[in-house]
């Protein structure tokens, strides 16, 4: 995706791509409603693409007091099937299973992780298991799967954590250059559902503004669809 242009087509050649270029303007900024409409009209892929958001923040992630990270419960969900693992002691395993966890256990899951068998998208753990999980932190950490109390994945509330993970909880984290990227639902969702997800996500990131940030916090917002167009949002329209 281009950092400076508000329209980018992530493929080359073909009649459909040329048609997509016509449906979005390279010299325009859009509000969220119009942006969603434009992306839908310009989508040409044969699968159901994901609505993606990229936010450029005026922060320096190298400073610990300017890290932006958290989770958002999307009102309309993500449209994806999420596999959840719960690492807990035996007496709470049945509770985790009833809650809907796909993988439940303790040392057996740790052994699978060490063997490279990671068959889950979210890992939840009870606090009393964190010492054991520490042995696989170097494996889970780089994959964004390490349980974290700040993200609600280290908790005594197994039922609530599993429900949140299954119903559309999305994690966000500012990367290099202050960029946040996330998928916020399928393009086939009704417009109003996508707008609810967008507003919930943007609001959460805005509220997560570090106190030490000087100057403009929101620098730019882009929306795109998988293998489709990218449009830039008019920041004044969401202020």
From Swiss-Prot:
GO terms for cellular component: large ribosomal subunit. It comes from the Bacteria. GO terms for biological process: regulation of translation; translation. GO terms for molecular function: rRNA binding; structural constituent of ribosome; tRNA binding. Keywords: Repressor, Ribonucleoprotein, Ribosomal protein, RNA-binding, rRNA-binding, Translation regulation, tRNA-binding. CDD domains: Ribosomal_L1. Transmembrane segments: none annotated. Gene3D superfamilies: 3.30.190.20, 3.40.50.790. The keyword rRNA-binding applies. InterPro entries: Ribosom_uL1_bac-type, Ribosomal_uL1, Ribosomal_uL1-like, Ribosomal_uL1/biogenesis, Ribosomal_uL1_3-a/b-sand, Ribosomal_uL1_CS. Belongs to the universal ribosomal protein uL1 family. PANTHER family: 54S RIBOSOMAL PROTEIN L1, MITOCHONDRIAL, LARGE RIBOSOMAL SUBUNIT PROTEIN UL1M. Binds directly to 23S rRNA. The L1 stalk is quite mobile in the ribosome, and is involved in E site tRNA release. Protein L1 is also a translational repressor protein, it controls the translation of the L11 operon by binding to its mRNA. Part of the 50S ribosomal subunit. NCBIfam families: rplA_bact. This is Large ribosomal subunit protein uL1. It comes from Rickettsia bellii (strain OSU 85-389).
